[in-house]
Amino acid sequence: MISRKSVITFGMVAIPIGMYTTTTDNDIRFNQLHKEDNSRIRYKKTCAHCGKEVKTEDIVKGYEYDDDKYVVITDEEIEKIKTEKEKSIQILHFAQLNQISPVYYEKTYQAVPETGGEKAFELLRSALMAEQKIAIGKTVMGTKDTLMAIIPREDGILISTMFYADDIKAIQKQYTKPEVNEQEFNMAKLLINSMDTPFDPSKYKDEYQERLRSLIETKISGKEIVAAEPESAGKVIDLMEALKASVEKAQKDKETA
């Protein structure tokens, strides 16, 4: 589903694009019910002044500039103050592909060229891939000046909205780094390499959501809920022994895969 249309601009080049959401929410949602009769809980929007219920079409946006004093702002007024530049994604500069910490990325979209923009789109994608660069751009989304990363892929371009530096919290708690001896370090590297396989997202499922869905189906059918088998905690052993045992298990798992 298309989220919005925009134009990527850099220099004198303009590339019309559609931005599509890349994820879907599959989480199970629960409704709030009245304990006595299992009826749905409803909420009403009411006016704080007169107490009347207010319909959606009668609700406007307002900014509180003083205690209980508001100025009403319409969507049309918000749209009017956007410049032509702000309606497009203006590329500000380019950076190394692996330079930006993942903590700055917020929401990701797939960019697809609109009719007439295919060649310029492919030129940007292939040039970014060849140079291993990403583009940093800016546009207005909603009521916010939004920073964006334009990320090349073999199969297209992704656009991620980004947090600003002052949106990111400083690391809340540091830790004292203990000494690691060479034998432990080498064994840890061996474990990492023994578990190294290409990333295949189709292999991973939300197993807890699957069990939750099974619980719901069991309750609907009136069957008894069976508790999951407890996993053995295992004994606390020496770090080196744990690393060795983990390497052996990983190697066996690879052989039987």
UniProtKB/Swiss-Prot annotation:
Supply the alphabetized keyword list: DNA damage, DNA recombination, DNA repair, DNA-binding
* Name the UniProt record assigns to this protein: Non-homologous end joining protein Ku
**GO MF annotation terms:** double-stranded DNA binding
Summary of the function given for this chain in its UniProt record: With LigD forms a non-homologous end joining (NHEJ) DNA repair enzyme, which repairs dsDNA breaks with reduced fidelity. Binds linear dsDNA with 5'- and 3'- overhangs but not closed circular dsDNA nor ssDNA. Recruits and stimulates the ligase activity of LigD.
Write down the NCBIfam families for this protein, in alphabetical order: Ku_bact
Report the SS bond pairs: none
Q: Whom does it interact with, and what assembly results?
A: Homodimer. Interacts with LigD.
Record keyword Methyltransferase present: no
The answer, when asked if Transport is one of the entry's keywords, is: no
Which family does the record assign? Belongs to the prokaryotic Ku family.
Ku domain segment(s): 9-184
Instruction: Indicate the segments annotated as coiled coil, or none if absent.
Output: none
Q: What is the lineage of its organism?
A: Bacteria, Bacillati, Bacillota, Clostridia, Lachnospirales
Q: Which Gene3D superfamilies match?
A: 2.40.290.10
Biological processes per GO annotation:
DNA recombination; double-strand break repair via nonhomologous end joining
